[in-house]
């Protein structure tokens, strides 16, 4: 259904248009996209005639600031925070609306000799400010189009236009598939672009390390920072190992209530203690402590979820009622940390099959699943049963 990101990058590099589709949980829309430096009047006319949506120009903020093109509003209340700026026309145009004159404005916006006085405001080109970090920060067409131009080695700007149906409604995936087929355009998804970038780019940096004596023995605490959200993650490392040696690993998501306060609503604290004890007994291994509180929803939202559970929802229902998926965690950052530590094969301490799939999806090999099942208690039996029945956790005692 979707072309590979490699194929799409090649088309962008060659000056061809593609269709980029976002997630069905977001807008579920498709935009025709072309690199700005490849966008001539023919491409603009195609968008106006066949795509029929609003023709916009994603571009990096640095260039917008150089040209003194400011945001359209000071307080953005758009549902998806689409970062429109004041519209512009190149001063060398007349009305600015024709395909030829819009193409001229696009070219002027990326021309290094252009200066702020070369543009009239308002105009007929709608610049969109790119959020640095791209689709890894915001999964929108603005970021997706710029990421593709950068991956193609072109100037970080694009021209995009939403695809509308003949009846004026927005084209969804079935119609977008037909549109792409009819016009011989490759179709790509932002989800695939996110996955591509996560696989190809290093998204964590090692900050420092220090000795950490614990009640379970001596570890080395290695601190990492994610380049996606600036969160810090900690790996507790014990011993040394050969490159191909399967290492005992626990990827543990932060749980303040369980790990620190000893909450009996979950089994997280006991799992943390058990994992550290097992690694210490083994003499080598890694405990990776990820800042993914509440399966990724954060501490305050987790307490809100607890309140909903007090009122009868289970842990999955509570997340959904708050507007979150059952599990927001992504294992790409954790996988990159493990690779940086020299882990290639692991004996993974987990009850969660999704965690195994998530880590293996980034090239790590899980040679064995080591169960880390704690005795359930009256306060957490329902929670654990929900994880087994609705999330597929492997819990033999329930």
UniProtKB/Swiss-Prot annotation:
GO terms for biological process: riboflavin biosynthetic process. Transmembrane segments: none annotated. It catalyses: D-ribulose 5-phosphate = (2S)-2-hydroxy-3-oxobutyl phosphate + formate + H(+); GTP + 4 H2O = 2,5-diamino-6-hydroxy-4-(5-phosphoribosylamino)-pyrimidine + formate + 2 phosphate + 3 H(+). Signal peptide: none annotated. Binds 2 divalent metal cations per subunit. Magnesium or manganese. Mg(2+) 2 binds at residues 27, 141. The active site is at residues 327, 329. One of its GO terms (cellular component) is cytosol. The record marks 124, 162 as: Essential for DHBP synthase activity. Zn(2+) binds at residues 255, 266, 268. Residues 1-199 are annotated as: DHBP synthase. One of its GO terms (molecular function) is zinc ion binding. InterPro entries: DHBP_synth_RibB-like_a/b_dom, DHBP_synthase_RibB, GTP_cyclohydro_II, RibA, RibA-like_sf, Riboflavin_synth_RibBA. D-ribulose 5-phosphate binds at residues 26-27, 31, 138-142, 162. Residues 200-398 are annotated as: GTP cyclohydrolase II. Its EC number is 4.1.99.12, 3.5.4.25. Its cofactor is Mg(2+); Mn(2+); Zn(2+). In the N-terminal section; belongs to the DHBP synthase family. In the C-terminal section; belongs to the GTP cyclohydrolase II family. Catalyzes the conversion of D-ribulose 5-phosphate to formate and 3,4-dihydroxy-2-butanone 4-phosphate. NCBIfam families: PRK00393.1, PRK09311.1, ribA, ribB. This is Riboflavin biosynthesis protein RibBA. The gene is ribBA.
């Amino acid at each position: 259904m979707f072309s590979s990101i490699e194929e799409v990058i090649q088309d962008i590099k060659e000056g061809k248009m593609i269709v980029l589709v976002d997630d069905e949980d977001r807008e579920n829309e498709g935009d025709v996209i072309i690199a700005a430096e490849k966008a001539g009047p023919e491409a603009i006319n195609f968008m106006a005639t066949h795509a029929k949506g609003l023709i916009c120009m994603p571009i990096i903020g640095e260039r917008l600031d150089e040209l003194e093109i400011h945001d359209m509003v000071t307080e953005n209340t758009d549902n998806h925070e689409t970062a429109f700026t004041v519209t512009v026309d190149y001063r060398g145009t007349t009305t600015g609306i024709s395909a030829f004159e819009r193409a001229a404005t696009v070219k002027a916006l990326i021309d290094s000799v252009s200066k702020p006085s070369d543009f009239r405001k308002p105009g007929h080109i709608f610049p969109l400010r790119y959020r640095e970090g791209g689709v890894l920060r915001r999964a929108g067409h603005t970021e997706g189009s710029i990421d593709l131009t950068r991956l193609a080695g072109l100037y970080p700007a694009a021209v995009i236009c939403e695809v509308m149906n003949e009846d004026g409604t927005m084209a969804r995936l079935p119609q977008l598939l037909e549109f792409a087929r009819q016009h011989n355009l490759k179709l790509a998804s932002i989800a695939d672009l996110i996955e591509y970038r996560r696989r190809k780019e290093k998204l964590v940096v090692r900050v420092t390390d220090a000795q950490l004596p614990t009640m379970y023995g001596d570890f080395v605490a290695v601190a990492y920072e994610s380049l996606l959200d600036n969160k810090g993650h900690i790996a507790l490392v014990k011993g040394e190992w050969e490159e191909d040696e399967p290492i005992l690993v626990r990827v543990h998501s932060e749980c303040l209530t369980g790990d620190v306060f000893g909450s009996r609503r979950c089994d997280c604290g006991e799992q943390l203690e058990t994992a550290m004890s097992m690694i210490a007994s083994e003499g080598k291994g890694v405990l990776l402590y990820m800042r993914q509180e509440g399966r990724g929803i954060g501490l305050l939202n987790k307490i809100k979820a607890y309140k909903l559970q007090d009122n009868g929802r289970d842990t999955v229902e509570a997340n959904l009622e708050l507007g979150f998926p059952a599990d927001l965690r992504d294992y790409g950052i954790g996988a990159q940390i493990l690779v940086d530590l020299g882990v290639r094969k692991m004996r993974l301490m987990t009850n969660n099959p999704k965690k195994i799939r998530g880590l293996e999806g980034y090239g790590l090999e899980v040679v064995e699943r080591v169960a880390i099942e704690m005795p359930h208690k009256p306060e957490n039996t329902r929670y654990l049963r929900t994880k087994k029945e609705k999330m597929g956790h492997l819990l033999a005692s329930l």
